[in-house]
């Protein structure tokens, strides 16, 4: 098993989560991993202060996967009415490609269904990341046809090229 423990984030984890997310989304040159977007977006994906703001909100959680005491994966889940937004899915680049992202996504969906009563999961993916969109489609997500501008004002990085877009995907919860 790739992780030993799944749990929600504590305030004391904010720095480790920010480091993991930035390592996964915007790694340094020479670091492998298939989910990074360094060629599309520059700057940090998140900051400690942004993680702290997320943790201060109600109906939102960051779930982490630990190997020993090290945070090696995370995902953010935020309730919005009858659905939940899922984002900031990150896996340490060394562990990518072994199923941990799929496991974290499934756990996020279960958490949203069980704790928030979510009927649908929604996420935004950089539209030019065809391999990442294909991953989510294999997990049961569907394209909504909704495409928005990259959220430059959100403090999640600066597009390297004009016109960067985000495609909105959704998945219905499997309530049984």
Stretch-by-stretch model annotation:
Residues 1-15, 167, 171-176:
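Conserved N-terminal entry element of GNAT/NAT acetyltransferase domains
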Residues 64, 70-78, 85-90:
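Conserved beta-strand in the GNAT
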Residues 91, 97-110, 138:
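Conserved acetyl-CoA-binding loop-helix of GNAT-fold acetyltransferases
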Residues 79, 92-98, 127-128:
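Active-site acidic-Proline motif in GNAT/NAT acetyltransferases
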Residues 103-120, 142:
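Conserved acyl-CoA
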Residues 22-51:
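Conserved GNAT-fold acetyl-CoA-binding loop/helix
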Residues 46-63, 162:
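A short helix-loop-beta-strand connector motif used in the catalytic cores of GNAT acetyltransferases and
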Residues 54, 119-134, 138-176:
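C-terminal "cap" of GNAT-fold acetyltransferases
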């Amino acid at each position: 098993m790739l992780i030993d423990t799944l749990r929600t984030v504590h305030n004391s984890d904010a720095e480790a989560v920010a480091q993991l997310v930035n390592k996964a989304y915007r790694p340094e040159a020479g670091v492998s991993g298939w989910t990074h977007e360094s060629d599309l977006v520059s700057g940090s994906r998140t900051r400690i202060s942004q993680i702290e703001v997320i943790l201060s909100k109600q109906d939102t959680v960051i779930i982490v996967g630990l190997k020993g005491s090290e945070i090696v994966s995370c995902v953010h889940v935020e309730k919005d009415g009858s659905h939940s937004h899922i984002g900031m899915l990150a896996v340490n680049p060394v562990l990518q490609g072994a199923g941990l992202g799929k496991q974290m996504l499934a756990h996020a969906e279960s958490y949203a269904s069980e704790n928030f009563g979510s009927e649908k999961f929604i996420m935004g993916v950089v539209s030019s990341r065809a391999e990442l969109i294909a991953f989510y489609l294999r997990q049961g997500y569907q394209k909504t046809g909704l495409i928005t501008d990259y959220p430059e004002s959100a403090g999640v990085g600066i597009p390297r090229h004009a016109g960067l877009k985000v495609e909105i995907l959704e998945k219905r919860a499997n309530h049984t």
